[in-house]
Amino acid sequence: MGDRDAIDLALGALRFRDLSAAELDARLDARGIECAERHEVLETLARAGYVSDERLAHTRAAALAERGCGDALIRVDLEGRGVASELVGRALETLEAERVRAERVAARRGWSPATIRYLAARGFSEEALETFVARDADGAIG
């Protein structure tokens, strides 16, 4: 397959949403594109600004945080997409504090033990949930 065909496949995959370099590489591999050609296509698209793991990390982290996800869930999502841990860490640093995001979710859902479980399942850290556990111990939740 020619470089142009591989680039067209890659651009088609990027048509509706950002993909990490690893995700795009896997898609091209599944379509039978050889390793050297995939590498060349990924470099070309990165230079042109079509593929950026850093941009993906920041936009995806912000979107997940807006949807009420904690840092652990965001980290798992991004690393599962093949984004480097360093880029994930930088993206998480730009987000609003996890405790503030957890409090916003709790204000919307109500302060209850079920909300604490919900937040834990959504990847919020124990540190972010300490406020809620303290309220529960004081009898303020429930």
Residue ranges, per PLM feature:
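An alpha-helical, amphipathic repeat domain used for nucleic-acid recognition
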Residues: 1-142
